[in-house]
Amino acid sequence: DRYIMRQKKLVYYGKKCLIFLISVFILSVAVFYVARLAPGDPLISYYGDRTEKMSPEEREWAMGKLGLNEPISVQYVKWVKNAFHGEFGISFKYKQDVVEVIGGRIGNTLVLGGIGFIIMFAGALLLGILCAWYENRLADRILCKLGTISSCIPEFWMALVLILVFSVNLKILPSSGAYSTGNAGDIGDRVLHLIMPLTIVVMEHLWYYAYMIRNKILEEVRADYVLLAKAKGLDKKKLMFRHCVRNVMPAYLSIMAIAVPHVLGGTYVVESVFSYPGIGALSYESARYHDYNLLMLLCMMSGILVIFCNIVSQTINEQIDPRMKDEVITEKSEVVEG
């Protein structure tokens, strides 16, 4: 039996790995062809104004130097081969290896997105539980109304309001950048620069997931076993936290796995508004200047993150939920009998 179970697990995870690899392959083809066939002249990004003065022969030589004069299928095969060796090409705009360019920016995005995700995850859970506990009472109504209003306000507009209030009028928070000039190592200065972008990232996603956890808890609260337990006089707090909240956590964890790329993607707009030197601003620049190598690697990183998180979420649903179902059935019978 153990051998059969191990074989089933190997087959199961093997299928997941195969799905991941096929998805990444399709993504790579789509990203490469869309980037290469997009309108624009990449030579302008690399050579600047000199491009206009080039003769046809010089343009041909320049295209050959950048590997852009070969058939697109040949370019794709070479790009994949180089990628397996960790070589993703040179940035046309920055004249550096694209890995080095991204490495200099990705830390800022991970800090902004990572801290934002943790705060949003914890805050949404607490707000969802609070709203479910005070269902249809004043606290629930106020929080739901505030959440609805907050969710309807565009990120960029909210960011501009914060800049106007706290930077222009009150002058207590910096309006742009990740740190002040010469203060790269000052943690306090970095925290001040992080406050407004972080606020926007959290507020943009917090209420959506708070509503979700509220509704899932209320679904559990209205389950037959909970109603019967209430009739038998079991403590409301014990029912809420030991059974209802616990039973919705697997579904919430799978949702949060999908939320990872969603939250990190939300930092792109925030970075542009606050001139925050992260991956979002870099993605915009790479698209604007037709920096193919940089743009393709950024798109691949984002796409792989989305694929990976979706597979993790699906795996959580398929692996945890069945076990939790058995556990829930046992708990329900204990609650009803007790």
Regions found by a protein language model. Give the residues of each.
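Hydrophobic alpha-helical transmembrane segments of membrane transport/permease proteins
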Residues: V24-V74, L170-D189
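Short hydrophobic, aromatic-rich alpha-helical segments embedded in or entering the lipid bilayer
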Residues: M54-H85, L194, F274-E285
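Membrane-water interface segments at transmembrane-helix boundaries in multipass membrane proteins
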Residues: K145-W207
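An internal, D/E-rich "acidic patch" concept
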Residues: M5-K9, L68-L125
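Cytoplasmic-entry segments and transmembrane alpha-helices of multi-pass inner-membrane transporters
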Residues: K8-K15, L126-L162, Y252
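Alpha-helical membrane-inserting segments
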Residues: I26, A30, V34, G123, ...
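N-terminal Sec/SRP start-transfer signal
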Residues: D1-I19, A231-K232
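Alpha-helical transmembrane segments of integral membrane proteins
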Residues: I106-A139, E155, A184-G338
